[in-house]
Curated annotation (Swiss-Prot):
Gene Ontology CC: one annotated term: plasma membrane
Presence of keyword Transmembrane: yes
Subcellular location: Cell membrane
Full protein name: Teichoic acid translocation permease protein TagG
Entry keyword annotation includes GTP-binding: no
Classification of source organism: Bacteria, Bacillati, Bacillota, Bacilli, Bacillales
Main localization category: membrane
Amino acid sequence: MNDLLRILREQITSFPLILRLAAYETKSKYQMNYLGVLWQFLNPLIQMLAYWFVFGMGIRKGGPVTTGAGEVPFIIWMLAGLIPWFFISPTILDGSNSVFKRINMVAKMNFPISSLPSVAIASNLFSYMIMMVIYIIVLLVNGVFPSVHWLQYIYYFICMIAFMFSFSLFNSTISVLIRDYQFLLQAVTRLLFFLLPIFWDVNAKLGQSHPELVPVLKLNPLFYIIEGFRNSFLDGAWFFHDMKYTLYFWLFTFLLLLVGSILHMKFRDKFVDFL
């Protein structure tokens, strides 16, 4: 428990430097390109249009989706899950590689290594925030107006950040110790894309044909986050309506953070030896 508290204190005390490093990393990543940081938004935008064309216009033939807010265009329903995924997916990979990638740099600085996963999270947040603003505009244009349920977006955002930090702290340590783990994580991330309720309503599609699979898919904490964002904007369901699932998510996140903190503190002084 002491390791966990120390890790959290390091995030708080290093917060200003985390933001500066994240901003620097974002700029340096695109500085050699003509369009610069604009690619941070163009790339997911192109993917959004491709997915909408294939799944919305192709498979669904342009049909609307029925939600708690009434019938809405498929693209609105899709983006509610896809935009969080565009943050989650690169953060999983960047966070897992954050210590291995920057250990030599921070070894010369008065900067806690445990904050490196936070830098990866913060750098991906810039484009995520822009995409969320665009999404809200799209909602308003299509007649989906703010309701009291929108307030719980803040709650699910906190859930997402808490889980991503816990997951990244754990993964960043394992990735240094076992380099093959990074390749495994890439494969799992690609698989998760199709197992999450991004393009399909799991409860509706599997609820009747294979109801036993629904609880299994919901064991994934990312399922809770993706479904929560959609509930906030479209379905009008409160997170406390399913307290067992909420408690499961936070217990899973806490245990992951605890294990990640213990492993990180145990090996942090030996990270350089594994490079």
